[in-house]
Amino acid sequence: MADELAAFPRPWWLVGGWAIEAATGFRHQHEDTDISILACDVPAFVAHMSGRWHVWSNAGGMLRPLGEQWTTVDEPRSQLWVRANATAPWVLNVLLTPDRARLWTNKLLPDHVAPVSEVTRAGADGIRYLQPEIVLLYKARLRRPKDDPDFDATLPLLSRQQRQRLRTALTAVVPDHPWHGRL
């Protein structure tokens, strides 16, 4: 799948646990592979994967195949699921990121708009990853115990500016989150 994505001519980046692992080296079991693309790039993504992969839209649990008949999604905050064929397991979860004029827009804080290059970083492998403080914000809203080790591994590596951005975002999104006391 990495080769397929490397040839995709639009921005994409790894998110979730893979982004935390790339930032920290902290390894854990991954349930799936999550990437993100700008919602405006869905037609290009569907065209790129066409003929080799089945791409489905998952909007609120409603699945719909994307291809010649449907090339776009109705909800720019939804997901795409990718698999090799109709009976194969899903191999990729594509989280759609709303955009404004091709600028990344935070799903939780819509006033946070930035170029993709500012909210992602290139790893040693050449792959782009969502900045760890943004990943932690998304994880914080879910309040899952499995995300605490990611926070523990990431916190010492965050710069003062990254900590401040996370603190400000947490205050707006999850003001009573227990991570506040450690930032």
Regions found by a protein language model. Give the residues of each.
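Compositionally biased terminal segments of proteins
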Residues: 1-183
